[in-house]
Swiss-Prot record:
UniProt gene name: tiprl
Family: Belongs to the TIP41 family.
Protein origin, superkingdom: Eukaryota
Taxon lineage: Eukaryota, Metazoa, Chordata, Craniata, Vertebrata
Function: May be a regulator of serine/threonine-protein phosphatases 2A (PP2A) and 4 (PP4).
Listed name of the protein: TIP41-like protein
Compartments, record wording: Cytoplasm
Swiss-Prot/TrEMBL keywords: Cytoplasm
Keyword match Cytoplasm: yes
Annotated InterPro entries: Phosphatase_reg/MetRdx, TIP41-like
Main location: cytoplasm
Length: 273
C-alpha cells in the first residue's frame, strides 16, 4: 500500500452539521517516532508511521469520531498474548533461516494487531455507544449514487522485515444523504497467517445515530490452499475466504435527541471547503 508521488494535503468537506476532515502528511521523523515509542512503552513503531494523519467526523456541537494511528497503537498491547500463541512461534519456525528472525520476534505484538474502532470526540458531549442488533444496509450501499466526497488515509504500515505486511488505513465516501467509512487493519505474515479487522461506520442524514460494525477475520495460510496465492496480497479479494472470528454491532447515538432537527441535511449545504 505504498503511496507513490505523495503530497501532503488537508481536505475538508461539509455534510449538513458535520465537518469531515482528512489530513495526510509525511511519515514521522525518526527522532519523533523514537520519542513516541518510548512514551507508549513500545520497542519501536511501524516503519511507516503517519502520526499526524487523521480522518475526523465532527458535529458542529463538538461531538464526533476520528481515526488516527497513535490511538490505534495504544490498544495493540491487549492483543499480545493471543498473537504469541496464534502466530509468533509458527512464524519463527517458518523463518528459521532468516537473519532477521531474532530481531523481529520480540516480546511484544510485532504485527501491531489492533482492534481500534475510532476515538470519540467531545468534552461535554460524546456519542453514546450501545450494543444493537441493527446492521448496516449493504443493499443501500450498492445503489448507484453520486459520490460527493471521497478520501483514503494511511495511518501506518510495516513490511515485517520483508516477510509480509501490517497496515491500517481508513477511507470515507459521502453520498447526497449519507456517508460510509471503512477502517481496515490488514495483516499478512507470509506462509503463516492472514488477519483482517474491519470497522464500518454508516450514517444517514435524517437519523440521530451512526451504525458501527466491527468484524475480525483470520486464517492460517495452510488453510487457504484452495485460494490463488496472488489474492493473499489483495485485502478486498482475500476477505471472502477468511473465517469470521468476531463481530460487534453498535449504535453510536447522538448525545441529545434534541439534536434531531439539527441533523436533517440540506443538500444545498453539502459542499467542499
Amino acid at each position: 500500500m505504498m503511496i507513490q508521488g505523495f503530497k501532503s494535503s488537508n481536505q475538508e468537506f461539509k455534510f449538513g452539521p458535520w465537518q469531515l476532515t482528512a489530513i495526510k502528511t509525511h511519515i514521522m521523523k525518526s527522532a519523533d517516532a523514537e520519542k513516541l515509542a518510548e512514551e507508549m512503552s513500545m520497542p519501536c513503531l511501524p516503519e511507516m508511521m503517519f502520526g499526524d494523519n487523521v480522518l475526523r467526523i465532527q458535529h458542529t456541537s463538538g461531538f464526533g469520531i476520528e481515526f488516527n494511528a497513535k490511538d490505534a497503537l495504544k490498544v495493540v498491547k491487549s492483543n499480545q498474548a493471543s498473537l504469541k500463541v496464534a502466530c509468533a512461534e509458527e512464524w519463527q519456525e517458518s523463518r528459521s533461516d532468516s537473519e532477521h528472525n531474532k530481531e523481529v520476534v520480540k516480546p511484544y505484538d510485532w504485527t501491531y494487531t489492533t482492534d481500534y474502532k475510532g476515538t470519540l470526540l467531545g468534552d461535554n458531549m460524546k456519542l453514546n455507544v450501545i450494543p444493537t442488533t441493527d446492521k448496516i444496509n449493504t443493499e443501500k450501499l450498492k445503489a448507484r449514487e453520486q459520490i460527493m466526497f471521497f478520501e483514503e488515509v494511511l495511518l501506518f504500515e510495516d513490511e515485517l522485515h520483508d516477510h509480509g505486511v501490517s497496515s491500517l488505513s481508513v477511507k470515507i465516501r459521502v453520498m447526497p444523504t449519507s456517508f460510509f467509512l471503512l477502517l481496515r487493519y490488514f495483516l499478512r505474515v507470509d506462509g503463516v497467517l492472514i488477519r483482517m479487522n474491519d470497522t464500518r461506520l454508516y450514517h444517514e442524514a435524517d437519523k440521530t445515530f451512526m451504525l458501527r460494525e466491527y468484524t475480525s477475520k483470520e486464517s492460517k495460510i495452510s488453510n487457504l490452499s484452495h485460494v490463488p496465492p496472488p489474492l493473499y496480497t489483495e485485502p478486498n479479494e482475500i476477505s471472502q475466504y477468511l473465517p469470521v472470528t468476531q463481530t460487534i454491532y453498535e449504535k453510536l447515538e447522538f448525545p441529545s435527541q434534541d439534536l434531531e432537527k439539527a441533523v436533517l441535511v440540506d443538500t444545498k449545504n453539502v459542499t467542499a471547503l
